Curated annotation (Swiss-Prot):
Family matches, as InterPro entries: Asp/Glu/hydantoin_racemase, Asp/Glu_race, Asp/Glu_racemase_AS_1, Asp/Glu_racemase_AS_2, Glu_race
Protein's UniProt name: Glutamate racemase
Job of this protein: Provides the (R)-glutamate required for cell wall biosynthesis.
Gene3D superfamilies: 3.40.50.1860
Family: Belongs to the aspartate/glutamate racemases family.
Gene source species: Mycobacterium bovis (strain BCG / Pasteur 1173P2)
GO molecular function: glutamate racemase activity
Length: 271
């Protein structure tokens, strides 16, 4: 039986999942968080589905083995690659980033034309397209935007170069006259201002990070595992499988003062 005092485990291929962690902290400030950024193997977008699945399940095994009460796959590529395996493998609730965003997009659209942008792995997996299949009267246009992650990981979230890239990527969505756009990668909220500028103010942007945090609230409430308000102050642990110093510098853009030190993960612990 899981304890309400146990932490919530969150992982991503790098720093993008910190947008999810930030949203969870905002909505559930009393919860302990353990976050693992797999910067030693990520970004996952260019990898094959079997490679992504292997890396993601190794981190999931580590977090579940450490006693988390819920596991959040804060990565669209990993969600599309290993969600079914994770839910069969673990005895704790597994929350992913795709379905929460799909539900919000269906509720938000006015003309039924919805766009999805993500990594090449996410778009070619058809995870979003399949998730939208149950929604009536929707027309989905999905576009891979692989270089967005590179810019975010470099800390470049504005400027002429990335705006030009965005305009090129998003042109098919404008032609399709989408009125709602799912940011199908947890890195992309850091580009939301630029994406909104390229798409126009009448297009609603749906952040998978915000919707996933709402799903974590719903799941923990449903199974009565919310951390009590009178519990000791929340602790947040951030770990990286790659260079912790580089992770810390970039992660500060996502979390600001909430971010403490980042601990390295020894390769022998996750394999």
């Amino acid at each position: 039986m899981n304890s309400p005092l146990a932490p919530v485990g969150v992982f991503d291929s790098g720093v993008g999942g910190l947008t999810v962690a930030r949203a969870i902290i905002d909505q559930l400030p009393d919860e302990d968080i353990v976050y693992v950024g797999d910067t030693g193997n990520g970004p996952y977008g260019p990898l094959t589905i079997p490679e992504i699945r292997a890396h993601a399940l190794a981190i999931g095994d580590d977090l579940v083995g450490r006693g988390v009460k819920a596991l959040v796959i804060a990565c669209n590529s990993a969600s599309s690659a290993c969600l079914r395996d994770a839910r069969e493998r673990y005895q704790v609730p597994v929350v992913e980033v795709i379905l929460p965003a799909v539900r919000r997009a269906v509720a938000a659209t006015r003309n039924g034309r919805i766009g999805v942008i993500g990594t090449r792995a996410t778009i070619t997996s058809h995870a979003y397209q399949d998730a939208f299949a149950a929604a009536r009267d929707t027309e989905i246009t999905a576009v891979a935007c692989p270089r967005f992650v590179d810019f975010v990981e470099l800390g470049v979230t504005s400027g002429r170069q990335v705006l030009g890239l965005a305009q090129g990527y998003l042109e098919p969505l404008q032609r399709a006259e989408v009125d709602t756009l799912v940011l199908g990668c947890t890195h992309y909220p850091l580009l939301s201002g630029l994406i909104q500028l390229a798409m126009g103010e009448n297009v609603t942007l749906v952040s998978s990070a915000e919707e996933t945090a709402k799903e974590v609230v719903r799941v923990l409430t449903e199974i009565d595992l919310l951390r009590p308000h009178d519990a000791p102050p929340a602790t947040r642990i951030f770990e990286a499988t790659g260079d912790p110093e580089a992770f810390t510098k970039l992660a500060a853009r996502f979390l600001g003062p909430v971010l403490g030190g980042v601990q390295p993960v020894h390769p022998s612990r996750i394999h």
